[in-house]
Swiss-Prot record:
Gene Ontology molecular function terms on file: actin monomer binding
Oligomeric and partner information: Occurs in many kinds of cells as a complex with monomeric actin in a 1:1 ratio.
Function of the protein: Binds to actin and affects the structure of the cytoskeleton. At high concentrations, profilin prevents the polymerization of actin, whereas it enhances it at low concentrations. By binding to PIP2, it inhibits the formation of IP3 and DG.
Keywords: Actin-binding, Cytoplasm, Cytoskeleton
Matches recorded under InterPro entries: PFN, PFN_euk, PFN_sf, Profilin_CS
GO cellular component: cell cortex; cytoskeleton
Name of protein: Profilin-1
Record's keyword annotation contains Cell membrane: no
Primary localisation category: cytoplasm
Localization annotation: Cytoplasm, Cytoskeleton
Free-text tissue specificity from the UniProt record: Cytoplasmic distribution in hypocotyls. In root nodules, it is found in all cells, but is more abundant in the vascular tissue as well as the endodermis.
A Pfam match: Profilin
Membership in a protein family: Belongs to the profilin family.
Length: 131
């Protein structure tokens, strides 16, 4: 299965009539493995900030989580495993696997819990596969 299939079928799936707005799977170096068509362009320093927060949880909280220049307020995540951000009626979930970052961006009417479930479920599956 290609990485794009994981994005198209597992991240952009429908859940209770809702879909993620954007989704991507990136290498931990920031290389794009697969993404939705309109996923924002990451800046190298944004990937560095995310990886630093996974290695030293809490480092993003004072400055915010940036994806494609958009700032998200960091909210409760799972240290070293999941970073969650909120911006207005939407937000983002970033799940770290052994080799990758699984990212989902949502907007209303999707809920934070729905986004978390989709992103973390795929991330957990990839971890089980050694990825």
């Amino acid at each position: 299965m290609s990485w794009q299939t994981y994005v198209d079928d597992h991240l952009l799936c429908e859940i209770e009539g809702n879909h993620l707005t954007h989704a991507a799977i990136l290498g931990q170096d920031g290389s794009v493995w697969a993404k939705s068509a309109s996923f924002p362009q990451f800046k190298p320093e944004e990937i560095t900030g995310i990886m630093n927060d996974f290695n030293e949880p809490g480092t993003l909280a004072p400055t915010g989580l940036y994806i494609g220049g958009t700032k998200y307020m960091v909210i409760q995540g799972e240290p070293g495993s999941v970073i969650r951000g909120k911006k207005g009626p939407g937000g983002v979930t970033v799940k770290k696997t052994n080799l990758a970052l699984v990212i989902g961006i949502y907007d209303e009417p999707m809920t934070p819990g729905q986004c978390n479930m989709i992103v973390e479920r795929l991330g957990d599956y990839l971890i089980e596969q050694g990825l």
